[in-house]
Amino acid sequence: MSTAVRPDEISAILRKQLSGFDSEVDVYDVGTVLQVGDGIARIYGLSKVAAGELVEFPHNVTGMVLNLEEDNVGAVLFGSSDLIKEGDTVKRTKILASIPVGEAMLGRVINPLGEPIDGKGAIKTEIRLPLERRAPGVIFRHPVKEPLQTGLKAIDSMIPIGRGQRELIIGDRQTGKTAVAIDTIINQKASHTKEAQEKGAKPVYCIYVATGQKASTVAQVVNILEKHGAMEYTTVISATASDPAPLQFISPYAGATLGEYFRDTGRHALVIYDDLSKQAVAYRQVSLLLRRPPGREAYPGDVFYLHSRLLERAARITNDDALAKQMNDLPDSIKPMAKGGGSLTALPIIETQAGDVSAYIPTNVISITDGQIFLESNLFNSGQRPAINVGISVSRVGGSAQIKGMKKVAGTLRLDLAQYRELEAFAKFGSDLDKATQAQLTRGGRLVEILKQGQYVPMAVEKQVAILFVGTQGILDTLPANLVRKFEVAFLEMLELKHKDILNTIATAGQMDADTQKKLRQVAEQFLETFKQANVK
């Protein structure tokens, strides 16, 4: 038996049905996939899309628009292209590529999109900053005056790095480039201690960007940083060799963005790009697939701009808070927190082939940066580690950031070593050397031994000044070269225990007055005699 609907009920039923109807309309700007493969998609229909804008593909795959052409747009995919097929719908997001930033990122391993990949749960942050951003203008910058200590004697003495500088680390594979960068991160631990901050030390937050590395290598780096307590103030951004080329291409920009968050809020950050050679290769792959015209070594014409726009973002910002808030391209999300006095220091790494620094990418990055640390296979294999070739390594702006005590003791160090290298080659041919030449060879040999340093044992700057003073003043000339490193360890331990006042004076004053020099010389000479009696047979 059917229930008849009475005519007077119809209007009430219709009114009830229509009351639940949602009249809002969702408007999407959509396009269609014309072609997909090798991490690239060509899309028809997204006529109003912007370059660098994120687009949404099916199966939660995100892409970024790089090519804008008359009849289609070219996008790179940050996920697998196997899931996407011809005819799929693509949505505009109207959002330029950005990552979440904040203190919650410290101690975590993330991918270049800011998503955690360390299995420690979600990261809660409120601020997002764009991956691409114009570098600060000239009026918002401040000269590099403050040192960034690496803890490596060879670098802090002869190739000093200042906060806000760009210093290239360049060398063949297996010469210790990553080790120099990791030692620098570990050395920043001293700036995070309570005692250091009470004395006015400004902590340095670190970002390590691993581009195109093996996943096992990245895991090893994270393990080393955790072991030395350095992950507390470090973020690792990883785009491994197995990740899509577009992720490898954007990874350094993600590192720069995170570093800018600390820089623009009045703090200090250090970002390490390991390495930009692999980023250039990933960008070349993406560009060729997008059918951009190739240039030298098949790199696209804008490969210089790829690195220059990244490295120019490293800067020391003016101390004027009001001026810092007016900085060009400062995102609205960070404006209320903006402060002056911050810095972003960049240590890009470039891998050379058979020591050829005149190749395309190495010469590009050398011309962009404020100096380079050149590591050599021959030095590495001969046992000099870190294997820094002091002759062609240079820091163009770090000299003004060096502490006075270090500048004084290391003033002649570069010249002494250069003369030693020259004489060493000459001495191989003849045995009859005059006394002055023999003295120079003896002094140089001791200095080379002093500059050797183990991995993951960065040294405080006051200890560096003390041991370099002993070496450059010729106090160790009578000690056999093979005992120099043993003497160094014992001497610094003795200073720490019995003459802490000398180290404290150097640390607080940043220089050595005549009294400190006299006292240090006496202590060193006395200890040398005792050491010789115990060790020289």
UniProtKB/Swiss-Prot annotation:
Its EC number is 7.1.2.2. Keywords: ATP synthesis, ATP-binding, Cell inner membrane, Cell membrane, CF(1), Hydrogen ion transport, Ion transport, Membrane, Nucleotide-binding, Translocase, Transport. The record marks 393 as: Required for activity. Pfam families: ATP-synt_ab, ATP-synt_ab_C, ATP-synt_ab_N. One of its GO terms (cellular component) is proton-transporting ATP synthase complex. InterPro entries: ATP_synth_asu-like_sf, ATP_synth_asu_C, ATP_synth_asu_C_sf, ATP_synth_F1_a_nt-bd_dom, ATP_synth_F1_asu, ATPase_a/bsu_AS, ATPase_F1/V1/A1_a/bsu_N, ATPase_F1/V1/A1_a/bsu_N_sf. Its main location: membrane. It is an enzyme of class 7 (translocase). It catalyses: ATP + H2O + 4 H(+)(in) = ADP + phosphate + 5 H(+)(out). It is found in: Cell inner membrane. Belongs to the ATPase alpha/beta chains family. F-type ATPases have 2 components, CF(1) - the catalytic core - and CF(0) - the membrane proton channel. CF(1) has five subunits: alpha(3), beta(3), gamma(1), delta(1), epsilon(1). CF(0) has four main subunits: a, b, b' and c. HAMAP family: ATP_synth_alpha_bact. This is ATP synthase subunit alpha. The lineage of its organism: Bacteria, Pseudomonadati, Chlorobiota, Chlorobiia, Chlorobiales.
